[in-house]
Design a protein with these regions (language model features):
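Extended, low-hydrophobicity segments enriched in charged/polar residues
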Residues: 53-56
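Oxyanion-binding/catalytic loops of NTP- or PPi-dependent enzymes
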Residues: 49
Length: 108
């Protein structure tokens, strides 16, 4: 199971998570995790906002930014978010556990 971050803000429970679909949505919007070193002022808040897509995709960006501005332990938070963001990508690239029903391919 994928990692999740859970918290409450203004009496509303939030669950942050990345799925294949939310990562794909972020990529289609132009998000590139590889830009984190060159553009941290935009990439880090976008990484945080992207974690809302799986369970709270209609949350207003103003609310997300308000939550972000009140967060503590941001170094640990961003390390966790990067790990969480990479989980669906690793799952996509991993091999199936068993061979039954899997498609094999060859180059000719």
């Amino acid at each position: 199971m994928a990692k999740q971050i859970k918290f409450e803000f203004k009496d509303k429970a939030y669950t942050l998570e990345y799925t294949r679909k939310s990562v794909e949505t972020m990529e289609k919007r132009g998000f590139k995790l590889s830009d984190i070193s060159d553009k941290p002022m935009s990439v880090l808040p976008d990484l945080f906002a992207g974690a809302f897509l799986a369970h709270h995709k209609f949350e207003k960006r103003e609310v997300i930014d308000e939550i972000f501005s009140g967060l503590r332990n941001r170094d640990e938070l961003f390390s966790t978010l990067v790990d969480m963001y990479n989980e669906p990508i690793v799952a996509l690239m991993s091999e199936p556990d068993d061979d039954e029903g899997n498609v094999t391919w060859t180059v000719q």
